[in-house]
Amino acid sequence: MTKYKVGMVSLGCDKNRVDSEIILGKMSNEYEITNNAKEADVIIVNTCGFIESAKQESIDTILEMAEYKNNYKCKLLIATGCLIQRYGDELKNLIPEIDIMLGVNDYNKIDKVIKEFIEGNKEASKLLNYSDENINEGNRILTTQKESAYIRIAEGCNNFCTYCIIPKIRGKFRSRRMENIISEATDLASQGVKELILIAQDTTQYGSDIYGKKNLHVLLKELSKIEGIKWIRVLYCYPEAIYDELIEEIAVNEKVVKYLDIPIQHISDHVLKLMGRKTSKKDITDKIEKLRKSIPNIIIRTTFIVGFPQETQEDFEEILEFLQEYKLDKVGVFKYSREEDTPASKMDGQIDEAIKKEREEKLMLSQEKISNDINKLKVNKKYDILIEEYDGEFYKGRNFEMAPDIDGNVFFESPKNLEIGEFVKVKIIKNMDYDLIGVVEDESCK
């Protein structure tokens, strides 16, 4: 019997990407995986439901894939992910073309449900699980470049920021067992992965629930023992949860890149309190100063939300002043999105969209100049570059200061053919606002 072909459309964040890879891994034994949705008998849309624009993209994608049932080979349309977890009861009536719905903790059942559906059990067609006890784990089919892989170390969140719906969708914070993470990382290394990117809603809380204390520093130490792994990168570190042993491990561990993604979200105490953040401006600046003192070459990335309810012009300008003083290396800016069922959505003082957009643009322009000034200092320096692409003329890669997709890239030429997924020494000869231009200094990294 010919195997059904399965296609996946994965939307949203890198945590969603890991879910998609686990789903594909689970499907690969019984089904053929295809990257061409037009060839797929089964199409899975893994949705995002975090902010309004993501919800709309998810709905548009589901409707687009529903057309494939009429125009191409698709016989079965499955919708999964955060949008389904959040609005599944409504969507099963609004979009009847969806044959199967799965909540964010149901992925371990997907092969069984598909088999039952194909065999005629339509009772399995609308399955939602609102339990927050499960953690999706299993063999993955990577959808990233072969040299880098995200590895989720925990699921859920206990922070309950007033603007965020994630705890209601993903449930309470739950760490994975360390031995399971090590096993997965070892398997990824055997596939040629050189860079592990640790993710969770709050990576700094890793271990606090199952080991009785924060254990991210221990996990980093154990991961660094895996042969073949050269870089270990940590994203989503809440500033108030960064602790001394973690700082020390990052400082001394050669495989842990000196880079931290720390979602500050705001710097005004007034807005931080409204956001339900468990920190203050002084705590944040003290933590940045401590990190820079302990790890002199550390790269700090952060994100800000502008246009939060009751954010004054003075609150906004406080972010600008903070960035001018502390000159963070990487900054992302988001306009506040009013999400139903969150405390912030019910607050007085909602900000006009035009003001949000103006503040977003002003903040990004300010950071653009800061980034350019920082990048100027990199000219004539040499870096180990992880090669990711070649377009026939230029190679593209990243140094340790750059996370995939969210930061810049290094572009360079080489007189010799280089292997994608390998490291090469590159001298920077020119900077741009976010990217760097270089030349190969030595075809082997020392």
Curated annotation (Swiss-Prot):
- InterPro entries per record: Elp3/MiaA/NifB-like_rSAM, Methylthiotransferase, Methylthiotransferase_CS, Methylthiotransferase_N, Methylthiotransferase_N_sf, NA-bd_OB-fold, Ribosomal_uS12_MeSTrfase_RimO, rSAM
The answer to whether keyword Cell membrane applies is: no
- EC number, UniProt record: 2.8.4.4
Which part of the chain is the Radical SAM core domain?
A: 143-373
Q: Specify the superkingdom.
A: Bacteria
* UniProt-listed GO biological process terms: tRNA modification
| The MTTase N-terminal domain, residue ranges | 4-119
Task: Name the residues that bind [4Fe-4S] cluster 1.
Answer: C13, C48, C82
Q: Which Gene3D superfamilies match?
A: Methylthiotransferase, N-terminal domain, Nucleic acid-binding proteins, tm_1862 like domain
Mention any Pfam family matching this sequence. Radical_SAM
- Provide the TRAM domain boundaries: 376-442
The record's keywords, sorted A to Z, are: 4Fe-4S, Cytoplasm, Iron, Iron-sulfur, Metal-binding, S-adenosyl-L-methionine, Transferase
Protein family: Belongs to the methylthiotransferase family. RimO subfamily.
The protein in question is named Ribosomal protein uS12 methylthiotransferase RimO
Record organism: Clostridium botulinum (strain Eklund 17B / Type B)
Q: Taxonomic classification, please? A: Bacteria, Bacillati, Bacillota, Clostridia, Eubacteriales
